[in-house]
A protein has these predicted regions:
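Conserved anion-binding
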Residues: 80, 86, 90-163, 167, ...
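Short, acidic/polar
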Residues: 23-37, 76-84, 150-162, 212-218
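N-terminal amphipathic alpha-helix/helix-capping segment at the start of soluble metabolic enzymes
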Residues: 1-23, 130-139, 195-203, 252
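Hydrophobic faces of well-ordered beta-strands that scaffold small-molecule active sites
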Residues: 19-23, 42-44, 70-74, 93-95, ...
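Conserved N-terminal beta1-alpha1 strand-loop-helix module at the mouth
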Residues: 1-70, 74-77, 143, 164-165
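C-terminal helical cap(s) of enzyme catalytic domains, especially alpha/beta-barrels
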Residues: 59, 63, 101-117, 233-252
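Short, electropositive alpha-helical surface patch
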Residues: 218-235
Length: 252
């Protein structure tokens, strides 16, 4: 028999470290290219992207090879969707649009085995060959809820009362829309709400996360956030731009 694979991102958060997670179009080969770059986890997109039950096993397996926590964002707060995603190999699940305490409690109920929750009793792909999987799984699974509506910000005190959620992630894009600013994540009004939510989460003793690129991550760390996802696509654009500039200079 073998030991249950450790959830690297969860361990690092529990150790007080910063966790950074690339997101964007992914396949197994691309995940492996991220492997040597030192990231804690990979964000597998099942709400706005093509990740589904057919490819979760192989995508999470690629993460396993490089000791990166596979984080799957599911498309809804649905018990069967959450526990089936864990069954197929996810070590962490991100659930969108958590706006109330009851919705947060539902995430825990779906994502944790008894006595914490009521996750369907089935051995995950992560549990293959693990003799005591059910007694260890709750310690190695990770739950992330998205605070991405203004109603969630207004209900944040009650949502933060829910235990067994690893990260309360403030998502600026949808938040901006619910504030009346579609596409306005960079507006000062939205940034103010995001920063206030991060302060409240971190001051409550819970872990705050958000979307942040190179320019903003230092500011959010100062506010107390410790979990960051970011798109790798700007790196691609910046690299392409630099290459084209170099070619143009060399041929002038």
């Amino acid at each position: 028999m073998t030991n249950l694979r450790q959830n690297k991102a969860k361990k690092n958060l529990n150790d007080g470290k910063i966790v950074s997670v690339p997101m964007g179009p992914l396949n197994g080969d691309l995940i492996e290219h991220f492997g040597p770059l030192g990231f804690d986890a990979m964000w597998l997109e099942g709400e706005h992207g093509p990740v589904d039950f057919n490819n979760i096993p192989d995508l999470t397996r690629a993460c396993d090879l490089w000791d990166m926590t596979p984080i799957v964002r599911v498309h809804q707060n649905d018990p069967a969707t959450i526990y089936r995603t864990f069954d197929l190999g996810a070590q962490a699940i991100t659930v969108p649009h958590i706006n109330t305490k009851d919705e947060a409690l539902s995430v825990v109920d779906s994502g944790k085995f008894a006595p914490i929750g009521n996750r369907g009793s089935f051995t995950s792909r992560q549990g293959i060959g693990v003799a005591n999987y059910f007694s260890q799984a709750n310690d190695q699974t990770m739950l992330i809820v998205l605070i991405e509506d203004i109603i969630a910000v207004n209900n944040l005190d009650e949502i933060l009362e829910v235990d067994n959620i690893d990260v309360f992630f403030v998502a600026p894009g949808d938040l901006a829309q619910t504030m009346g600013f579609p596409g306005g994540a960079n507006r000062s009004e939205v940034k103010e709400v995001v920063e206030g939510a991060i302060r409240k989460i971190s001051s409550s003793g819970k872990i705050a996360g958000t979307l942040a690129g190179t320019e903003a991550v230092g500011r959010y760390i100062d506010l107390g956030a410790r979990f960051f996802s970011f798109s790798y696509l700007p790196w691609l654009a910046q690299g392409a731009e630099k290459f084209h500039e170099t070619v143009q200079k060399a041929t002038q």
